[in-house]
Amino acid sequence: MTIINGKTKLLGVIGDPIGHTLSPPMHNAAIDALGLNYVYLPLPIAPENLETAIAGLSAIDLEGFSVTIPHKLAIIPLLSQITEKARLVGAVNTVWRTETGWQGTNTDVDGFLAPLKSLDKDWSQVNPVILGNGGAARAVVVACAQLGCGEIHVVGRNQKKLDPFKESWANTSLYDLLEVHSWDELEGLVSTTELLINSTPIGMSPQGEQSPVELELLDLLPPSAIAYDLIYNPRPTKFLRLARTRGIRIIDGLEMLVNQGAIALEIWLGQPVPVSVMREALLKQF
């Protein structure tokens, strides 16, 4: 275990509330395994204090930090630069220090992709169906485009929010790939997709016995399909349990969580990190 001393370098995660975060045990386990003199701390920051806090983090020479709810959008104007990936998603979850100030990116995109990249699929022939059109769905849309998928279908319950969701990409290459649908169109989409993704909070603890779709819809998936849930608690979710009973390959949100964290830690440390150690540390939290 790292012994904190006068030379310990600081990392952290900002959010409000922050008590639920699983990031400190995950990051500190990797830091300990690497034998580095760093520590990763939870930093509770209320929205009204964000601007003052970011200036303070700069003043104390914090090396970098993760950003969670509710600051992923609000922090953008406080940064000197953001990556194109963060601009497309419209949210920042990882920040690091540069000579010109704080720079931000979004590691959720590559975190989501990590378990998919190892699969032997021609992604250009896959037309993903994404359940939900909130902030998490934005990262998934960008990820699916980066993967080289065909049409990307986003299904939401609120029609008034679906059209603005698509129009937010009007001046990007993603616009022509993206189609938005109301929930009653879902049945017609499921039978043609090999990648069904839940980006909604439906099924998250403590409502672990809920699923965004029922077994009858999952029966329509082709045998080669993948069911991917961004939720990591409970493990597995009801959505994934149902998919598994039909022989569908499943991926849960823990893989996205650990991989997005590993990518962030590599940015801060400037070296490879032990992803397996981070995964093991996360599993101990359940």
From Swiss-Prot:
The protein's matches in SUPFAM superfamilies, at most eight in alphabetical order, are given as: Aminoacid dehydrogenase-like, N-terminal domain, NAD(P)-binding Rossmann-fold domains
Note the subunit structure: Homodimer.
Instruction: Please state what class of enzyme this protein is.
Output: oxidoreductase
**Naturally occurring in which organism (per UniProt):** Microcystis aeruginosa (strain NIES-843 / IAM M-2473)
Its annotated pathway? Answer: Metabolic intermediate biosynthesis; chorismate biosynthesis; chorismate from D-erythrose 4-phosphate and phosphoenolpyruvate: step 4/7
**Active site, UniProt feature:** K72 (proton acceptor)
Q: Which GO molecular-function terms appear in the entry?
A: NADP binding; shikimate 3-dehydrogenase (NADP+) activity
An example of a Gene Ontology cellular component annotation for this protein is:
cytosol
Record-stated family: Belongs to the shikimate dehydrogenase family.
Give me the residues that bind NADP(+), please: E84, G132, N133, G134, G135, A136, L230, G253
- What's an example Gene Ontology biological process for this entry? shikimate metabolic process
Its UniProt entry gives the catalysed reaction(s) as: shikimate + NADP(+) = 3-dehydroshikimate + NADPH + H(+)
- Residues annotated as binding shikimate are T21, L22, S23, T68, N93, D108, Y232
Q: Does the keyword Protein transport apply?
A: no
Q: List the disulfide bonds.
A: none
Q: What does this protein do?
A: Involved in the biosynthesis of the chorismate, which leads to the biosynthesis of aromatic amino acids. Catalyzes the reversible NADPH linked reduction of 3-dehydroshikimate (DHSA) to yield shikimate (SA).
Could you identify this protein by its name? Shikimate dehydrogenase (NADP(+))
* Matching InterPro entries: Aminoacid_DH-like_N_sf (IPR046346), NAD(P)-bd_dom_sf (IPR036291), SDH_C (IPR041121), Shikimate_DH (IPR011342), Shikimate_DH-bd_N (IPR013708), Shikimate_DH_fam (IPR022893)
Q: What is its EC number?
A: 1.1.1.25
For this protein, the record's Pfam families field holds: SDH_C, Shikimate_dh_N
Q: Which UniProt keywords apply?
A: Amino-acid biosynthesis, Aromatic amino acid biosynthesis, NADP, Oxidoreductase
Q: Which CDD domains match?
A: NAD_bind_Shikimate_DH
